[in-house]
Amino acid sequence: MNKNIFFTAMAALMLSACGNQTKQQPETVGKNTASTEPELIFVRGPKASDKLFTGTAYVNELVPKSDSTAYAIGDVVFEPGCRNNWHTHQVRQIILVTEGKGWYQERGKEAVPLKKGDVYIIPAGMEHWHGATKDSRFVHIVVTDYQDDSCVIWGNPVTDEEYNTL
């Protein structure tokens, strides 16, 4: 069932990305992005900012936002115990889990466990965080929609007290 959701979401994304395009030449964005680490699909990106993540994370910008797109696609690797800060997207975000176990939590609600194969759509304006469980690496592809040139408002870190209650 999760594979069907994953492939349906990817097909819908590809169709929506192609739907408003005029005739253009194909563009290769991610040459040599395949990972040599057998459990990872894409090569690790650079280490993420300590100001936005607690713990170690790597962000690989697979498809950057451009003048012709209203979204960006990234691959994020969270090492065990790592999580990003509370944040809000002005437009929705889609999480496609490709490895491991993680958490997604909206402010004031119970955390939702995420695992390989899960697809999660985060509505616009929802303050939330996501990251790895204490004992598992967590990897996801994120499709982040933009409103003009902005996509996220960053908040405070998820405290150890908040995280350790999971």
Give names to the regions the model predicted:
Residues 103, 124-151:
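Ligand-binding loop in jelly-roll beta-barrel domains
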Residues 1-4:
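Positively charged n-region of N-terminal signal peptides that target proteins for export
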Residues 75-79, 89-104, 143-145:
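Short, conserved beta-strand element in jelly-roll/cupin
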Residues 16-17:
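C-terminal motif of bacterial Sec signal peptides marking the signal peptidase cleavage site
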Residues 21-70, 153-166:
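A short, N-terminal "cap"/entry segment at the start of jelly-roll beta-barrel domains
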Residues 108-125:
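Short acidic-glycine-tyrosine-enriched beta hairpin
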